[in-house]
Structures are given as C-alpha cells and as structure tokens.
C-alpha cells in the first residue's frame, strides 16, 4: 500500500506499507524542498523467526568496488563472494560509478552490516532473528522481535567519494 502523506512547498513524503508473513514494514520516504538527500524512516513490527531482512538499493552507478566507512577511515571492498558475504560499515557506504563522475551514498546511524551484491547493488542488514541460541543465556533466537525503528538516507554526489560527498 502506498499513501501520499505530504505534497507541498516543504517537500514530498509518502508511506509504503508491506507485509511479509507476520511482519509489517512501514517506510516513510521523504524529500525536502531543496534537500540534498532522500530520507527513509522505517518502523517494522518484526515477527519473523529464523530470518534475516535487508534493505536493497539498486543504482545506476556501476562499479565492482564500493567504499565502506570505518569511523576512523574508509575501506574499498569488491563485490561479495562465497567467503565474504557481509562486511561492517559505521555510518555510510558509497558506490561511485567507475567513470568517477558521480556516486551514491547510503547513510545510516544505526545499521552496520552490509553487502555489495553486484556492480550496482548495495544491501543493508536491518533485522535478524537467528535460528539458534549460540550461548545458552543469549536469547539470540528472540533478537529483533517486536517493534524496530531506524532511519537512513540516500545521497547522490558528483565526482569521487570524499569528505565533501558525505553529509
């Protein structure tokens, strides 16, 4: 279900509601008038056991390498492989087109697991309920169940990734 919730001089926003099994995903996607990025506010009632959920971003930028923020620096990583299927990033991940003329950054203050599926796709892990408890007292099989709120933004830029391309 898609519903327009704001369309005026301040900007535009719409709400997308989706269900998967017993879980409900509500995303508000907003662009402020004159804004530099698209902001996404997510509220998920997570009731899926033994499941991992990811937000997937498919872009026109094409490169087998992306840049992942590590808080004290950044690292370039290639597309995922059988042995490297998820990597950490602190605040942002950037996919700059191999031409170097433009790129896209996904900025998140609270989600840290990522993968680069192919030359134009980034995926951010947002929820996870493992199948097993790996420690008897950990309750990992209940992790992330219930209401979860998180936000992220998509920011486009000219040129290579750098200090001036991050918000």
For the regions a protein language model found, what residue spans apply to each?
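C-terminal (or distal) subdomains of carbohydrate-active enzymes
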Residues: 1-167
């Amino acid at each position: 279900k898609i519903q327009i919730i704001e369309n005026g001089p301040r900007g535009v926003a719409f709400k997308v509601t989706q269900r998967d099994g017993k879980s409900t995903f509500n995303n508000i996607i907003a662009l402020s008038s004159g804004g530099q990025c698209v902001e996404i506010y997510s509220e998920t009632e997570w009731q899926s056991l033994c499941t991992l959920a990811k937000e997937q971003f498919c872009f026109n930028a094409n490169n087998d390498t992306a840049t992942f923020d590590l808080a004290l620096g950044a690292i370039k990583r290639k597309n995922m492989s059988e042995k490297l299927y998820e990597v950490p990033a602190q605040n942002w991940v950037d996919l700059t087109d191999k031409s170097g003329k433009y790129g896209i950054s996904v900025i998140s203050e609270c989600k840290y697991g990522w993968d680069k599926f192919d030359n134009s796709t980034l995926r951010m892990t947002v929820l996870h309920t493992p199948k097993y408890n790996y420690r008897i007292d950990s309750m990992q099989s209940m992790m992330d169940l219930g209401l979860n709120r998180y936000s992220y933004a998509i920011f486009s830029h000219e040129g290579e990734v750098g200090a001036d391309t991050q918000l």
